[in-house]
């Protein structure tokens, strides 16, 4: 009986360890509209809290736009010549690996000045419930940042079909809850 309980406990811990990394949120920039000229990305970001471990997915026409992560000064001036990273494949995923301000623009001339720019503040941990911060994309004015060079890597993914929400994080929590409940009821019975 002790061996059986130990085995169930090990299984429970393995399930929890596999589920925890999946609790990060994947945000589709612009929701169903995607990364387009004329999008209001300041409003889009205003009700979201970004945390280290989350990801941004930019969906756009391959070759028609780019996603460039830039420094704050390049964000304000809509300059992509010194981009930290750039991608133009049509489906760009940016993992948020570092806390602080992150700035994104479309590097195609005229697109950033037409509204294709996004500024977000990434929190160190997803456990906090403080309000999100976003710099308005139309004014180009933002508060100074002590960290002008956010570290991020650009990877590409195949676009995924999004339903009503741009963020996905509830189902892993629900799955974890039911798995733990089932295992606990098995151990206690």
Swiss-Prot record:
Residues 127-160 have a biased composition (Low complexity). Disulfide bonds join 78-106. Residues 1-24 form the signal peptide. It comes from the Eukaryota. Cu cation binds at residues 65, 106, 111. Residues 127-165 are annotated as: Disordered. One of its GO terms (cellular component) is plasma membrane. This is Blue copper protein.
């Amino acid at each position: 009986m002790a061996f059986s309980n130990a085995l169930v406990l090990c299984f429970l811990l393995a399930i929890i360890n596999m589920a925890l990394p999946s609790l990060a949120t994947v945000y589709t920039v612009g929701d169903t509209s995607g990364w387009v000229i004329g999008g209001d990305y300041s409003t889009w970001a205003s009700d979201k809290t970004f945390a280290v471990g989350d990801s941004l997915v930019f969906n756009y026409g391959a070759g028609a736009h780019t996603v460039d992560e830039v420094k704050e000064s390049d964000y304000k001036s809509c300059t992509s010549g010194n981009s930290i990273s750039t991608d133009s494949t049509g489906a760009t995923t940016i993992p948020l690996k570092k806390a602080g301000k992150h700035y994104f623009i479309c590097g195609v001339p005229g697109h950033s000045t037409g509204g294709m720019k996004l500024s977000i503040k990434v929190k160190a941990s997803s456990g906090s419930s403080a309000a999100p911060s976003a710099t308005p994309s139309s004014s180009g004015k933002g508060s100074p940042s002590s960290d002008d060079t956010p570290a991020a890597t650009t990877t590409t993914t195949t676009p995924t079909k999004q339903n009503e929400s741009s963020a996905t994080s509830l189902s892993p929590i629900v799955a974890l809850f039911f798995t733990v409940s089932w295992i606990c009821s098995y151990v206690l019975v």
